[in-house]
Amino acid sequence: MSDPREIAQRVLEEWEPKTKLGRLVKEGQITDIHEIFRKGYQIKEPEIVDVLLPEVNLRENQEVLDIALTVRMTDSGRRIRFRVLAAVGNRDGYVGLGIGHGREVGIAIRKAINYAKMNIIEIKRGCGSWECRCRRPHSIPFAVEGKEGSVRVKLMPGPRGLGLVIGDVGKKILTLAGVQDVWSQTLGETRTTVNFAKAVFNALYNTNRVAIKPEDIERYGIVVGRAMPTTFEVE
């Protein structure tokens, strides 16, 4: 099933919410994911994202970033499990990162994607590059940093056409978030995929923690979440 409207409609028909937020979404009292972040709700059911941001279920909007095999010794012998790091996004201001474990790769991937949905964030985009000033949300409006373990990542606004000057894992996360042009600096053991991915994700989250002045919104073309209007509605 590749139509976001069909995905959302199917979830609404089959889903039995377990949380207050889930019931509000199911009953149609919350119809925009931006409202969830504005009111400070915590997403504890992946179906909430399936309904409000169904495009994240499209194959091109999901990325498996890392698969690792873990072995643990028990009284009954070795227990082998898979650990999967996955990301989801709508390529327009929303991105999530999650880790899933399972005895089979497929199960671990599904868990990771569901955790990524529940961990989805809304980011600020804009054009903060002094080389550009086009006021379009192709980059980020200001420099931000994120860290995880020994890894530190700094993202800086880039001019249109620059592309994503960052490692492959970072490119995938930024692309899913809808960021097209950035410079980056990294410190620490960046070959550790999980920590590097989390540092990039944390940097994007920190776009929400920088105070902005009203005049900066127009100057840098800042948008929060979606820049493009939704092209579908769920009945």
From Swiss-Prot:
One of its GO terms (molecular function) is rRNA binding. Keywords: Metal-binding, Ribonucleoprotein, Ribosomal protein, RNA-binding, rRNA-binding, Zinc. PROSITE patterns: RIBOSOMAL_S5 (PS00585), S5_DSRBD (PS50881). One of its GO terms (biological process) is translation. Residues 60-123 form the S5 DRBM domain. Its cofactor is Zn(2+). GO terms for cellular component: cytosolic small ribosomal subunit. InterPro entries: Ribosomal_Su5_D2-typ_SF, Ribosomal_uS5, Ribosomal_uS5_arc, Ribosomal_uS5_C, Ribosomal_uS5_euk/arc, Ribosomal_uS5_N, Ribosomal_uS5_N_CS, Ribsml_uS5_D2-typ_fold_subgr. Binds 1 Zn(2+) ion per subunit. Zn(2+) binds at residues 127, 132, 134, 138. The keyword Ribonucleoprotein applies. Pfam families: Ribosomal_S5 (PF00333), Ribosomal_S5_C (PF03719). With S4 and S12 plays an important role in translational accuracy. HAMAP family: Ribosomal_uS5_A. Part of the 30S ribosomal subunit. Contacts protein S4. The N-terminal domain interacts with the head of the 30S subunit; the C-terminal domain interacts with the body and contacts protein S4. The interaction surface between S4 and S5 is involved in control of translational fidelity. Belongs to the universal ribosomal protein uS5 family. This is Small ribosomal subunit protein uS5. It comes from Thermococcus kodakarensis (strain ATCC BAA-918 / JCM 12380 / KOD1) (Pyrococcus kodakaraensis (strain KOD1)).
